[in-house]
């Protein structure tokens, strides 16, 4: 009898151990915005941004793709600027192409972060408050509409995630070559993880960004909001000029697939880029005048120091300004439509450096 009891106790212990292991390996449901995605399922909903005096509020559509096994939480955000269409369309596709049953971890998708700008087709700024959403993070609960959108994204998405990709393209007036920003002002381990994520995304031109704020309360930019909270962050650019071209959309899809493979959230995906072009010193070139812009340089063009990038005229055609590159480098984007206001960007130039170790001289 004693032997039988011992065997039974041993069997019960084994069963409990196996149940414990299975529980440790099981994915949990994910709930946010009033919807729940069980393991191995997809769920979609909307965050509500309540109205305040001066605006009607808005909604932020999102999807949860919850895998069957535990793993990272990757947040993908599109539509921070409303006329940046390829990121929005790429995430529409990814919502249905990512199979949650073959996924480890969770993918959180923000389909259109800036719905007011998207519906009103406004570049740069929100139509109700004139603010650039990607300059007001982490946001304010009692602020203007852009502030409140940023606060919801910070609280509901960024703070839930382990990795964040803010997916952009050139705005409706911008023509650009694909590239990404790698922020190095975060903690060394976070910066290294973010670098590996940039390589995994696969865009071969990577700007080494050394000027982002380090305070979580003054993070300003969406991806930097993740980094100041100890999470890997990345900003990528693919497409522009209000276009919906297949190449720009597919490039984003491939990039996300590469990151999912890198994070071991999926078994398959593209290899990381191995021959990156690292870009160090950079400058956004701006107009000193309001008038008409005539771009001369093109995205992807290598230019010498002093090369002509653009001209600005008044509304009668009289030349007001010639804008030149301050150094030899590569043109990453130009504003490609005629309207230009004083102080607005006309182009972005960056200088090639030897590798990711580059830092500005102090």
How should each PLM-predicted stretch be described?
Residues 10-20:
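Bacterial N-terminal signal peptides
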